[in-house]
Each structure stands twice: as structure tokens, then as C-alpha cells.
Curated annotation (Swiss-Prot):
It comes from Haemophilus influenzae (strain ATCC 51907 / DSM 11121 / KW20 / Rd). Residues 1-26 form the signal peptide. The keyword Protease does not apply. This is Periplasmic nitrate reductase, electron transfer subunit. Heme c 2 binds at residues 105, 124, 127-128. Heme c 1 binds at residues 70, 84, 87-88.
Length: 150
């Protein structure tokens, strides 16, 4: 009798597991590749106190990437789309009045200049960052090189 109860318990547990797993498998699969605009990596973090659009902030050292003088909230920069180039590409900068991307952005790792931006320089926000008008979290005693900065 005890053996039979154990067997029935195992069978019932197996049935419930199969039903539960079956219902999970039957549910709709996520729409991969269809609409990724709400994927976690495509939702930008909140950015507060962006400076007003205006002149470029001063550089602090030689070869510093220029800082972005406007908000880039909701800008899409992915392997397929780079919204920065809507204004900053050589063709569009003439119309938009935006700063043209540097010729160095067209060089590959061997120094050869191509007709389009190099993959190494395509993701603008790796180096060029927006600034915010906030108090520093920690004191900063950095002094810009002579001839640079404010």
C-alpha cells in the first residue's frame, strides 16, 4: 500500500510538472528581432540638467574628445543606426551647421583613410559625452594644460 502511494505521488508529480512545462512552452515566444526599441539596452538612463545648446565646452588636455554641448537623450547609436551622423556627418554638417566629425574618424587601424567612418570610431558616445550642470560628487583639483580649459 505504501509502495502504491509513492508510485501515485510520483505519477501525479510528473503530470503536474508536464502540465506546467507544457503551458510555459505553449506561451507566446518573445518577438526577437521584430521590435527591440523597448529592450533594456535601448532605454537610455535619465539625464537631468543638460546644458543649453551652445558653444563647445573648453578642452582640458591635448587630444581630448570634444564634449557634447546638447542632450543625447533618446539618441539611437547602434550597429545599424547612428543618429549623431544625421547632423555631424560631412554631408549633413554643411546643412545643419553642426561640427563635422574629425577626419581621424575615417582612418582604419593602419592609418588608411576610407570613405565612411571607421568601425573603431562609429560609436560616438564611447568618447564624446554630454555634460550636466551639477555639483561635483567629489572635489576636483584638476588643472587644465596651459592654453586649454577655462
Amino acid at each position: 500500500m505504501i509502495n502504491m502511494t509513492k508510485q501515485v505521488s510520483k505519477i501525479l508529480a510528473g503530470l503536474f510538472t508536464a502540465l506546467f512545462a507544457g503551458s510555459l512552452m505553449a506561451s507566446d515566444a518573445p518577438a526577437v528581432g521584430k521590435d527591440l526599441t523597448q529592450a533594456a539596452e535601448n532605454i537610455p538612463p535619465a539625464f537631468h540638467n543638460a546644458p543649453r545648446q551652445g558653444e563647445l565646452p573648453a578642452l582640458n588636455y591635448v587630444n581630448q574628445p570634444p564634449m557634447v554641448p546638447h542632450s543625447v537623450a533618446n539618441y539611437q547609436v547602434t550597429k545599424n543606426v547612428n543618429q549623431c551622423l544625421n547632423c555631424h556627418s560631412p554631408e549633413n554638417s554643411r546643412l545643419s551647421g553642426a561640427t563635422r566629425i574629425s577626419p581621424t574618424h575615417f582612418m582604419d587601424r593602419d592609418g588608411k583613410v576610407g570613405s565612411s567612418s571607421s568601425p573603431r570610431r562609429y560609436f560616438c558616445l564611447q568618447c564624446h559625452v554630454s555634460q550636466a550642470n551639477v555639483d561635483p560628487i567629489v572635489p576636483n583639483d584638476f588643472k587644465p594644460m596651459k592654453g586649454y580649459g577655462n
